[in-house]
Amino acid sequence: MATVLQHPPFFYLSASPYNLYPFLKRFRDQHFPTGTMILRNASWQNLGGLITSLQQNTQEYKVSRIEKIHSWFPRRQFVCIGDSTQSDPESYGECARKFPGWIKAIYINKVTDIAEMDVKNRNSDERFEKAFKGLDRSLWHVYTDAGELRERVDRLSRQG
């Protein structure tokens, strides 16, 4: 994907606590392009960060970090890739409405194999329609196969 998109900057935004950084970094290094990891500052070693983290829900956290990325790169376009397990659709939809034209595409992996997840509600068409309300339907896509994501990214890169 990095080659197809001509080596763009990658940001890995997760609501996971910073304590998981070593594990997540190893995983990223084995499977994904190098990029900046943005994790929650939730640690007993930083009480202020822990309290803030506990008070902020996942969507608020992700939107605030995406706003920060936008402040760094307001003239670049971004592709957001997430999944249906938490609030990626809602976070990306909110940011796409807030910064029209800044997000070039949104791809959401419809996760179906996590037992603890409310798959029916998390993966419902209604949820995705609500999350992306007011956005052009061509901006976002929900997929279940990684090959489909690859095809979409290839097509996006050819569009320029």
PLM regions: where:
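C-terminal cap/substrate-recognition subdomain and adjoining C-terminal extension
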Residues: 16-160
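Glycine- and small hydrophobic-enriched segments that form the cores of compact globular domains
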Residues: 1-17, 22
